[in-house]
């Protein structure tokens, strides 16, 4: 078992002169030996300011070299970084910090007014200057504490869930989960020792994919992590070309934006030999465009903050369904019965993951009730529904919470969304159930379009598909964008609130759509 710090230290031992971190905006580079020196220096500073082993220390920063060094320095000390999404509003951060009894937060001078809120009662704020982050503190009496190997179950990091149904839960990741998470993701990304691996950090490191799969995975294999602080698709395309990026690991939203920017051209991405998407189901039109433009295997990853990547598809353009990951054991179980009882092939149920797997979390921070609800009889309940087909592949059908009950029939929102998204003018689609006196709920589609479209054309797409008649949307709305939470996932709860406010509106007689504007997402 190796800690995150030890993985980086081993890489520094193997190739001290290789470039570990590269800031694409300034061009500043850190070799592995320089990175290791910075980590030790910042760890010394933090220890001198009172940070101790097993202490919860919060950060809320974007993808930067400074943030990376701080997180590794905390891990070096045996402290527990609590990595908060910087997109959360200040009052949400304060609620998390107070609820989870976090007594120390770290900011940098460069953050200015961003990052964790200042002046929280009972919380110590450590502000690190550029000088400290670049030089550390090495004077007599301030030697870096000796490294102490942790126990496998000791907490290593805390990440937060996306919070689609309320305040995010703190997911405690133990030290024994670090290597399995990194190794599975890195091998799927095609990383190999001795290879030339340049990874563009599009995925944020407050997300487990961005941290273990891109950031730490890159460093564990002597690659170069190129952090993207703020996503600009045109600039990202330029960086891919200029910096010879070899792996693009991002969300479907990122890929859609990259393909849509005027800066995009297939030849600008000729250095890319690996593409992975995660975080949400991908629109088939995006997948086809990626395949046509890049002509490299496109890997589909499924996972959760709690279990990392339980399922994957090594070539999403050629194969249907997903396979269990190397460090996971999965099955489908009845929602109302023990998850230890597996359903037979072809029978739909809830996806559950073996909670004893090395990559799995231990518990939710200060939330034993939530832990008990999710880990049952040794299995983690994902809340996702699906089944195993006759070939042994896992077919996911959607979220159990997103199930629509219309006329006593169950409809998976994601299934309908995938059908509607087949129309080339549909940029994004979300399907929800709205209250209806006759049917209980009526299937309702909300779309973002790239060109004029009518509801009749979308209905024809459904009629021409394999979709059952009762699953067809009966109402269509068109909006400027879909509402998203701080994790950039579509917020169906917010969407239902908008739709409720416009439920009495009449469709445009020419298009069949009810149209309204959604305020800018968080």
Swiss-Prot record:
pH-linked activity: Optimum pH is 7.0.
SUPFAM superfamilies registered for this protein in UniProt: Acetyl-CoA synthetase-like (SSF56801)
Cross-referenced Pfam families: AMP-binding, AMP-binding_C
Temperature dependence: Optimum temperature is 25 degrees Celsius.
One GO term (biological process): fatty acid metabolic process
Signal peptide: none
GO MF assignments: 4-chlorobenzoate-CoA ligase activity; ATP binding; medium-chain fatty acid-CoA ligase activity
Keyword Cell membrane: no
Annotated positions binding ATP: 161-169, 300-305, 410
The protein's enzyme class: ligase
Named cofactor requirement(s): Mg(2+)
UniProt keyword Magnesium, yes or no: no
EC number annotated for this UniProt entry: 6.2.1.33
Subunit record text: Homodimer.
Similarity section: Belongs to the ATP-dependent AMP-binding enzyme family.
Function, in words: Catalyzes the formation of chlorobenzoyl-CoA via a 2 step reaction. First 4-chlorobenzoate is adenylated by ATP, followed by acyl transfer from the 4-chlorobenzoyl-AMP intermediate to CoA. Benzoate, 4-bromobenzoate, 4-iodobenzoate and 4-fluorobenzoate also act as substrates. Inactive towards 4-nitrobenzoate.
Stated name of the protein: 4-chlorobenzoate--CoA ligase
Organism: Arthrobacter sp
Gene: fcbA1
């Amino acid at each position: 078992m190796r800690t995150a710090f030890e993985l980086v230290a081993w890489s520094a031992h193997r190739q001290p002169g290789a470039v570990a971190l590269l800031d694409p905006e300034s061009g500043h580079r850190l070799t592995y030996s320089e990175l290791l020196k910075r980590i030790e220096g910042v760890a010394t500073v933090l220890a001198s300011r009172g940070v101790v082993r097993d202490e919860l220390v919060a950060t809320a920063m974007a993808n930067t070299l400074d943030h990376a060094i701080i997180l590794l320095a905390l891990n070096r000390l045996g402290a527990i970084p609590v990595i908060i999404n910087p997109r959360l509003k200040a009052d949400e951060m304060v609620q998390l910090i107070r609820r989870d009894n976090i007594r120390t937060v770290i900011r940098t001078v460069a953050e200015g007014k961003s990052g964790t809120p200042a002046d929280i009662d009972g919380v110590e704020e450590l502000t690190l200057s550029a000088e400290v982050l670049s030089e550390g503190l090495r004077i007599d009496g301030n030697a870096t504490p000796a490294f102490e190997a942790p126990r496998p179950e000791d907490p290593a990091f805390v990440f937060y869930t996306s919070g689609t149904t309320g305040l995010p839960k703190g997911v405690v990741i133990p030290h024994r989960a670090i290597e399995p998470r990194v190794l599975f993701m890195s091998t799927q990304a095609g990383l190999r020792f001795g290879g030339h691996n340049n990874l563009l950090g599009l995925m944020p490191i407050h997300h487990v994919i961005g941290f273990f799969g891109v950031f730490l995975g890159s460093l564990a294999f002597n690659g170069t992590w190129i952090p993207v602080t703020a996503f600009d698709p045109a600039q990202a395309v330029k960086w891919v070309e200029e910096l010879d990026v070899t792996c693009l690991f991002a969300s479907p939203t990122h890929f859609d934006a990259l393909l849509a920017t005027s800066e995009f051209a297939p030849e600008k991405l000729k250095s890319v030999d690996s593409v992975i998407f995660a975080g949400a189901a991908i629109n088939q039109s995006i997948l086809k465009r990626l395949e046509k433009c890049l002509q490299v295997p496109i890997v589909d990853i499924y996972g959760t903050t709690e279990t990392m990547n339980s399922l994957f598809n090594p070539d999403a353009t050629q194969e249907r369904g997903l396979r269990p990951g190397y460090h996971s054991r999965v099955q489908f179980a009845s929602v109302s019965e023990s998850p230890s009882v597996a359903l037979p092939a072809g029978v739909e149920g809830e996806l559950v993951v073996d909670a004893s797997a090395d990559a799995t979390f231990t518990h939710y921070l200060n939330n034993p009730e939530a832990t008990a609800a999710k880990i049952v009889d040794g299995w983690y309940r994902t809340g996702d529904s699906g089944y195993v087909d006759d070939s042994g592949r896992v077919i996911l059908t959607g979220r159990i919470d997103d199930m629509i009950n219309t006329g006593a029939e169950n409809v998976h929102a994601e299934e309908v969304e995938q059908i509607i998204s087949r129309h080339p003018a549909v940029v994004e689609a979300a399907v929800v159930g709205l209250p209806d006196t006759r049917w209980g709920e009526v299937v309702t589609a909300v779309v973002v379009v790239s060109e004029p479209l009518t509801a009749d054309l979308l209905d024809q797409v459904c009629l021409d598909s394999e979709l059952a008649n009762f699953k067809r949307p009966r109402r269509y709305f068109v909006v400027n964008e879909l509402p998203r939470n701080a994790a950039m996932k579509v917020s169906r709860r917010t969407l239902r609130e908008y739709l409720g406010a416009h439920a009495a509106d009449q469709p445009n007689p020419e298009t069949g759509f009810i149209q309204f504007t959604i305020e800018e997402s968080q």
